[in-house]
């Protein structure tokens, strides 16, 4: 395995102080991060999330996806739980990279959906891999997970690596007029387990504020 642990530090956030653990993939040069909160036990089911990098959603507040909403909600949920983890994986654009993601967005602006755009660029709908989580989970000492995700591929990935997914916790947030089609495509073509009636509508929440 090419993933190497590098260092840890405190990370103060609006939801509390997390511990940030840095990892480096010597084969790809990519740097991944595990955030932990509270005391984690290998014997207890721990609330957590596998989150793939989304610069546009996580840092630039894009409404084209639900990624930023999911990350913030997951961190808040972990803090409220008193313990948990977030694995932040550098797999921008479902694995195609930032510039190709912008190219895909350009095609989406012309009418393609998120899957069609990737395929027109010569990529699979989802290029992500999850084998890097094995040493990351070993480092933070978690073996049983209550996984916050709508994506069955993440559940299967954890199970295939010998981790026990005790519960799948839906994370359905961030629906708005800009990403309705994107969310529908994730459900119908990528198999994400989502029910429209259980979404928090970001537009509605903004109006409440």
Swiss-Prot record:
GO BP: riboflavin biosynthetic process
Cofactor notes: Binds 1 zinc ion per subunit.
Stored InterPro entries: GTP_cyclohydro_II, RibA, RibA-like_sf
Pathway: Cofactor biosynthesis; riboflavin biosynthesis; 5-amino-6-(D-ribitylamino)uracil from GTP: step 1/4
GO cellular-component term (any): cytosol
Lineage: superkingdom: Bacteria
Gene assigned in the entry: ribA
Catalysed conversion reaction: GTP + 4 H2O = 2,5-diamino-6-hydroxy-4-(5-phosphoribosylamino)-pyrimidine + formate + 2 phosphate + 3 H(+)
Assigned protein family: Belongs to the GTP cyclohydrolase II family.
Listed cofactors: Zn(2+)
Protein name, UniProt field: GTP cyclohydrolase-2
Alphabetical UniProt keywords: GTP-binding, Hydrolase, Metal-binding, Nucleotide-binding, Riboflavin biosynthesis, Zinc
Record-level Gene Ontology MF annotations: GTP binding; GTP cyclohydrolase II activity; zinc ion binding
E.C. designation(s): 3.5.4.25
One Pfam family cited in the UniProt record for this chain: GTP_cyclohydro2
Active site as annotated: 126, 128
Source organism (scientific name): Shewanella halifaxensis (strain HAW-EB4)
């Amino acid at each position: 395995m090419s993933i190497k642990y590098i260092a840890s530090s405190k990370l103060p956030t609006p939801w509390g102080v997390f511990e940030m653990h840095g990892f480096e993939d010597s084969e790809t040069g990519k740097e991944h991060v595990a955030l932990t909160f509270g005391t984690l036990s290998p014997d207890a089911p721990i609330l957590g999330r596998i989150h793939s990098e989304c610069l546009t959603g996580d840092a630039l507040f894009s409404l084209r996806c639900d990624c930023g909403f999911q990350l913030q909600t997951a961190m808040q949920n972990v803090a409220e739980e008193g313990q948990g983890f977030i694995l932040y994986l550098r797999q921008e654009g479902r694995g195609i990279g930032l510039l190709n993601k912008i190219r895909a967005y350009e095609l989406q602006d012309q009418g393609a959906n998120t899957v069609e755009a990737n395929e027109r660029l010569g990529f699979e709908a989802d290029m992500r891999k999850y084998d890097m989580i094995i040493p990351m989970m070993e480092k933070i000492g978690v073996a049983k997970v209550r996984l916050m995700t709508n994506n069955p591929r993440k559940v299967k990935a954890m199970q295939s690596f010998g981790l026990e997914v005790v519960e799948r916790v839906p994370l359905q947030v961030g629906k708005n007029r800009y990403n309705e089609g994107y969310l529908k495509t994730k459900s119908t073509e990528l198999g994400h387990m989502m029910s429209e009636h259980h979404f928090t509508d970001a537009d509605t929440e903004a109006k409440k504020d």
